[in-house]
Design a protein with these regions (language model features):
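Terminal helix-turn-helix DNA-binding modules in bacterial transcription factors
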Residues: 184-188, 192-204
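Alpha-helical bundle regulatory/interaction domains
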Residues: 1-149, 153-164, 168-174, 187-188, ...
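Residues within the DNA-recognition helix of helix-turn-helix
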Residues: 180
Length: 204
């Protein structure tokens, strides 16, 4: 409950199928943290494996992934505006990328990745992840977080909202709003609204 304003949900995928399975994934408008405890997935668009544990940035296109063996993965799905509060990094740096946790130069995050991949019990893994983020949250003093929370309330309430209305909800100038939004959400307001509209169209 304490982390619910920051983490939308966790999901765990396990599959021992011997035959490779292909899946098309679409943008969901949220950044994610992915821990592969089994075999990594193969990115068919990029012709490479996903990193073992990585930060998944915002993207606007679909991606085709292929299993390469036994799948066991834990994914943390952040609230759209909350990743910066938990990772302490401007998240626009991850736009369109899957960045290995070891490449972020964050020793605590690398240690978490190792702990999760070395722990067999997934409930214990979730507990380790939550303890890590609670420590991060108490060390974060981002005054723009409440502004971004208000912006996303407006997006959820008004399907056809525009960017000037969002910058007004954030009490920021258009230029300031664009910069703060990218720092917290990992993409531009225009691109994010496009993702939201695509998601709504997919689930109509």
């Amino acid at each position: 409950p304490v982390l619910s304003p920051y983490i939308r949900h966790y999901w765990i995928l396990q599959d021992d199928a011997a035959v490779s399975v292909s899946e098309r994934t679409f943008p969901i408008g949220c950044m994610q943290l992915v821990f592969h405890k089994g075999k990594q997935l193969f990115l068919q668009n990029d012709l490479k494996l996903q990193p073992q544990s990585f930060i998944c940035g915002q993207s606007i296109g679909f991606s085709d992934v292929l299993s390469t063996g036994r799948i066991e993965m834990i994914t943390v799905v952040f609230q759209p505006y909350a990743t910066k509060a938990l990772l302490h990094i401007p998240v626009h740096l991850f736009h369109g990328k899957d960045v290995a946790m070891d490449e972020v130069e964050d020793v605590e995050l690398s240690d978490l990745a190792k702990q999760v991949t070395d722990t067999s019990d997934n409930i214990v893994c979730i507990r380790l992840i939550e303890q890590f983020f609670l420590r991060r949250l108490y060390a974060f003093s981002g005054y723009n977080l409440k502004r971004m929370s208000a912006v996303f309330q407006e997006i959820n309430l008004q399907p056809q909202i525009n960017i000037p209305q969002l910058s007004e909800a954030a009490c920021l100038s258009s230029k300031q709003f664009g910069r703060v939004f990218a720092d917290y959400v990992g993409t531009t307001p225009k691109e994010y609204l496009r993702i939201v509209r695509m998601q709504r169209a997919l689930f109509l």
